Amino acid sequence: MFRTMLGGKIHRATVTEADLNYVGSITVDQDLLDAAGIYPNEKVAIVNNNNGERFETYTISGKRGSGVVCLNGAAARLVQKGDIVIIMSYVQLSEPEIAAHEPKVVLVDGNNKIRDIISYEPPHTVL
């Protein structure tokens, strides 16, 4: 049996752009994708902390060091520049793999620069 577990997460990223006319997806600074273990073209779930929207799309590699987090296509209607989002990828693991699995949680500052990378989320803690 396989279970779906959090693989990587970029926590509280700031939306830098929303481009309705692009084909689709989310463009993310490649440094952030690497830190979270998320690949270009990988399916991700997005949560918008400002309005509660939850949706899925796939990633596109953005310029390294740019801090870009741009929602493209129809997803651009679900965010505004300056919104705070959480970007999550998931992995399928067998039960024996779960015990050794540690997700990568990337904490960023207001400019989408890496502040810290952790492998757990303490309960009842504001990060």
Swiss-Prot record:
State its Enzyme Commission number(s): 4.1.1.11
PTM sites of type Pyruvic acid (Ser):
25
* Catalytic activity line of the entry: L-aspartate + H(+) = beta-alanine + CO2
Quote the cellular component terms of the Gene Ontology held in the record. cytosol
Where it mainly occurs, coarsely classed, is cytoplasm
Query: Which GO terms of the molecular function aspect are on file?
Result: aspartate 1-decarboxylase activity
Task: Tell me which UniProt keywords the record has, alphabetically.
Answer: Autocatalytic cleavage, Cytoplasm, Decarboxylase, Lyase, Pantothenate biosynthesis, Pyruvate, Schiff base, Zymogen
Give the pathway. Answer: Cofactor biosynthesis; (R)-pantothenate biosynthesis; beta-alanine from L-aspartate: step 1/1
Output the PTM entry: Is synthesized initially as an inactive proenzyme, which is activated by self-cleavage at a specific serine bond to produce a beta-subunit with a hydroxyl group at its C-terminus and an alpha-subunit with a pyruvoyl group at its N-terminus.
Family designation: Belongs to the PanD family.
Output this protein's name. Answer: Aspartate 1-decarboxylase
